[in-house]
Amino acid sequence: MKQALSLIGVSFLSVVSSLAADKKPNIILILADDMRASGMNFLGKEQVQTPNLDKLAGESTVFTNAHIMGGTSGAVSMPSRAMLMTGKYLYNLEKQGATIPNSHTMIGETLQKAGYNTFHTGKWHSSYEALNRCFKEGKAIFFGGMWDHWNVPLYDYHADMNYGKRRPVIHNQAKSNKVEYEIGEYMYSGKHSVDIFTHEAVEYIQQQKDKNQPFFLSVAYMSPHDPRSMPDEYMQLYDQSQIQLPPNFMEKHPFDNGELEIRDE
């Protein structure tokens, strides 16, 4: 199997330069949503347990002076994702990255021209058209900003961009047989979003291992973006009474900016 190159929120300059080589590496982009440096043990947060990231960091180059540019609206992850995919600065994006015009070439498009198969699973908080330009395959895709991690409405990749399908749902069968239609082709109720996207990524890698074509795999997690919810096995790793809170922590935001009841960060 071709050598895998894992990239986490870094510049693609080294990737593009490597395409001239005879043997093109497979590329895996793993993107965590709204994850801060303070959430990683190897960056000095000793009370946080991140053994896998610590091991990866020990074998990698870590860009400790790289910072996100933020956003000009309430969203930070959406423009950050668009900047990463296009190489554009914040103020050169269109609509904060909610749409990515044809003139903004994405990394997936560049890799396709170099002979790569491109696959995405996970969050894509941008347009359908941009997704289909950047990738030619995909499964378990979430179009949106935030959602219940245990009940994620998902779509598989559609070359014709037919992402308008809705799921029939009866919310209260005891009181009514009324059918409502909600976003998403399907849903794995009770399965955490991290497990869903990881499964699809592993399945894709297994399918590609005997193929000669190099691949670009994008795995975009919805976590740790709020709402804060995680499997109990990870909650049990910590004694909540011993967690040290930062000096600027507040139980509740002092004023309502219009999102007080839907955000927990």
List each language-model region with its residue ranges.
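N-terminal signal peptide c-region/cleavage motif recognized by signal peptidases
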Residues: 15-17
